[in-house]
């Protein structure tokens, strides 16, 4: 029995739609895996909102950095980036770096999410950069793939930047940086072998 043209046409459209959805989902999932931050709602910083790769709101962070909650250190696969509100006139709300001194592989953004630059400094072979704060830079996003024992950053908890959290290669929290770039502490220059990468947030 012959299949009516309308049914054949609708079946073709359905198959095409499924194929396009599969390709789009695959492309999406590949893109999402490139630069997610590694955190979860409990461990996320209070006052910061966390979003998926397509901009869907996931949750507000629950942990006060001055009184952190006992949270697991797993990465919520839904979370891709965060946005933290700025308190006007508060210089502590932003990270202090510049494009030259910024970590290679990390992207730096303004407070409204405008891309400023990619960091230029390889932690294994740092460039001779000034230590001034670029007023345009508010926060950074670094690929999770950098959390690798093959490319650890060279710092320690004392010398680490205040407002940045430091992690080992498997994502375990090590410490929060203690050094204010405007009033740096007298810290040793040794590399803590436990530290592999950092995540810096720009709210207090």
From Swiss-Prot:
One Pfam family named in its UniProt record: Prot_inhib_II
Signal peptide: 1-25
InterPro entries found in the cross-reference section: Prot_inh_I20 (IPR003465), Protease_inhibitor_I20 (IPR051391)
Highest rank taxon of the organism: Eukaryota
Molecular function GO labels: serine-type endopeptidase inhibitor activity
Organism: Capsicum annuum
Gene3D superfamilies on file: 3.30.60.30
Family assignment from sequence similarity: Belongs to the protease inhibitor I20 (potato type II proteinase inhibitor) family.
Alphabetically ordered keywords of this record: Disulfide bond, Protease inhibitor, Repeat, Serine protease inhibitor, Signal
UniProt protein name: Wound-induced proteinase inhibitor 2
Disulfide bonds: 28-100, 38-75, 41-59, 42-71, 48-84, 99-117
Annotated Sequence repeat ranges: 25-67, 68-125, 126-183, 184-204
Repeat among keywords: yes
């Amino acid at each position: 029995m012959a299949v009516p043209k309308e049914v054949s046409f609708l079946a073709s459209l359905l198959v095409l739609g499924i194929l396009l959805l599969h390709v789009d989902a695959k492309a999406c999932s590949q893109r999402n895996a490139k630069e997610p931050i590694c955190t979860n709602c409990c461990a996320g910083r209070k006052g910061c909102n966390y979003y998926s790769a397509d901009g869907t709101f996931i949750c507000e962070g629950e942990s006060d950095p001055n009184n952190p909650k006992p949270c697991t250190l797993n990465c919520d696969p839904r979370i891709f980036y965060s946005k933290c509100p700025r308190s006007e006139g508060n210089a502590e709300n932003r990270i202090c770096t510049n494009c030259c001194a910024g970590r290679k592989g990390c992207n730096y953004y303004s407070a409204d999410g405008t891309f400023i630059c990619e960091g230029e400094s390889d932690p294994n072979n740092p460039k001779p950069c000034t230590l001034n704060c670029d007023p345009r830079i508010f926060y950074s996003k670094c690929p999770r793939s950098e959390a690798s024992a093959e490319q650890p950053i060279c710092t320690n908890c004392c010398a680490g930047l205040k407002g940045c959290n430091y992690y080992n290669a498997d994502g375990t929290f090590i410490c929060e940086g203690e050094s204010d770039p405007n009033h740096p502490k007298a810290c040793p220059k040794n590399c803590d072998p436990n530290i592999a990468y950092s995540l810096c947030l720009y709210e207090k």
